[in-house]
Amino acid sequence: MESTIGIDAGGTLTKIAYLNEKKKLTFEKFYSNEQDKIIDWLKKQTSIKQICITGGKAKQLQQLLSDSYKIVELNEFEATLVGVRYILKEEKYDINNFVLTNIGTGTSIHYIYNDRYIRAGGTGVGGGTIMGLSKLLTNIDHFEDVIPLTKVGSRKGLDITVGDIYGGILSPIDNSLTASNFGKAATIESNYNNSDILATVQGLVGEVVTALSLQFAETKNIDHIIYIGSTLCNNIHLQNIISSYTKYQNKTPIFLRDGGNSGAIGALLYATNKKS
């Protein structure tokens, strides 16, 4: 039986969404620079005839696949929105207006109004920042190795908090808020290890991304911020940082179970509906 798959070729990861033999939504993930592995996997799936490709590296991958498959292109923001809408429905959320923050290699932020999206902005701080700084500071360069170490790390020896600055004096804002990411590394002798460094890197990224998302949400008086992206996958530490900061500012954070695959899901649904 002929089948269709959706591919989201991102800057760091390439995600694939397809229906398995039991018609269950299934995912595969590869590093985007491992194109040989992607092609080898596709060759083993002999039923695939059509591929819908989205993402920043879609053109590169399309050039390698166009002779073997029918290719459908889709704008990555449209694909992501289709995927997010599908996941929201599956997870029983009834939300029409929200800020969508997609933490990939960098971070892209959109306003979503029903089926309409408007790019609010973004930042170069994202998953690529986590991996780049992790490599520079600890020489650890695999996301799968970063996550377990981050879980046991502490930011206390590296970040300066508001409480550190004010001491016992009453401060105008919450003492637990970060006053300077990595600030203690330059000012005092502090005991820290690789786990602490990795936890602090994630704190930096999480707070920058959340602060920007909150500013956009506040500007348009939007209550819900949906955070997606592969950077959040199994990354409870980063999710907790984002969640607590978002709630502190009286906004509602939402993390979708398969949010990192939303682009691939959207591509699959778009091509499947177009075909039918």
Curated annotation (Swiss-Prot):
GO terms for cellular component: cytosol. Pfam families: Fumble. PANTHER family: 4'-PHOSPHOPANTETHEINE PHOSPHATASE, PANTOTHENATE KINASE. It catalyses: (R)-pantothenate + ATP = (R)-4'-phosphopantothenate + ADP + H(+). The active site is at E76 (proton acceptor). It is an enzyme of class 2 (transferase). Its main location: cytoplasm. Keywords: ATP-binding, Coenzyme A biosynthesis, Cytoplasm, Kinase, Nucleotide-binding, Transferase. The keyword Kinase applies. Pathway: Cofactor biosynthesis; coenzyme A biosynthesis; CoA from (R)-pantothenate: step 1/5. This is Type II pantothenate kinase. GO terms for biological process: coenzyme A biosynthetic process. Belongs to the type II pantothenate kinase family. ATP binds at residues 8-15, 105, 127-131, 143, 230. It is found in: Cytoplasm. Coiled coil: none annotated. CDD domains: ASKHA_NBD_PanK-II_bac (cd24085). The lineage of its organism: Bacteria, Bacillati, Bacillota, Bacilli, Bacillales. GO terms for molecular function: ATP binding; pantothenate kinase activity. The gene is coaW. InterPro entries: ATPase_NBD, Type_II_PanK, Type_II_PanK_bac. Its EC number is 2.7.1.33. Catalyzes the phosphorylation of pantothenate (Pan), the first step in CoA biosynthesis. Homodimer. It comes from Bacillus cereus (strain ZK / E33L).
